[in-house]
Amino acid sequence: MKRQKRDRQSRAHTRGYQAGISGRSKEHCPYQIDAIKSQWLGGWREAIEDKQQGLFK
């Protein structure tokens, strides 16, 4: 059975989260489309909050 690709917005959120955990700035968002960019930034913000709470070093 073939695996379905996750939708673009879900991938953007995940990549934004990974960027936030690794300490990258939100200005490094690679997306131009507003809906996808907002998902990336949402993931980035979530990661920053998790880092501040001490979930990641």
From Swiss-Prot:
One GO cellular component term noted in the UniProt record for this chain: cytoplasm
Q: Where in the cell is it found?
A: Cytoplasm
Gene3D superfamilies linked: ribosome modulation factor like domain
- Which region ranges are annotated with the description Disordered? 1-24
Q: Name one Pfam family in it.
A: RMF
List all Basic residues biased stretches: 1-14
Task: List the InterPro entries hit by this protein, alphabetically.
Answer: Ribosome_modulation_factor, RMF_sf
Role this protein plays: During stationary phase, converts 70S ribosomes to an inactive dimeric form (100S ribosomes).
The entry sums up its family as follows: Belongs to the ribosome modulation factor family.
List the NCBIfam families: PRK14563.1 (NF011162), Rmf_CrpP_fam (NF041886)
Q: What is this protein called?
A: Ribosome modulation factor 1
